[in-house]
Amino acid sequence: ACVVERHFPEPLQRADGIEAVLDGLLAEVARVLEGRGQGGRSFEAGLFHTDGQVRRLTVATGRPTRDGAAVMRLFRERIATLADPIDPGYGFDVIRLAVPLAEPLAPAAPDLDGRAAGQEAVADLVDRLATRLGPDRVLRLVARDSHHPEREAALVPWTGGAAGGIGWPPALPDEPPSRPLQIFDPPQPVE
């Protein structure tokens, strides 16, 4: 976990000032996480009012990241979809940014065909949709062990990882297919 915060002698009351402070805190968090070789999966901003109230905003990512701009976009999405908008009132004394969940993040080099960029774009889209709609509303298919072809896959919430499925084993070159290549409608008797 990583926590950084800013204290203000004069309470902060403007929304653009809050975003600027969050940008700075995200840059600090990125430096700390980079030193540890980690990336954040969950980010929590705590906005402390002068009257003692605390407003917390949490965003999560599908993969570890240190990209402050991407996390800031998620915070903007979260703020835009709040039922109760952020009211600074008399202002904020402290803004705290915490990373409660961090995982190892190895440096990644893109493939020669540019596939890494496409995978990152899909992961960013999933993060934005999960922030807008909720993490349980963004689904993906995983393999299941079943003898019925229509039950070979199941919908599960997107987590960004490969967990949750059995994975289809690769076919061996000399092995016949495990089921017919064509399903007849109506079914035909096997002779």
Label each region the model flagged:
Residues 1-191:
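Non-catalytic peripheral regions of nucleotide-handling enzymes
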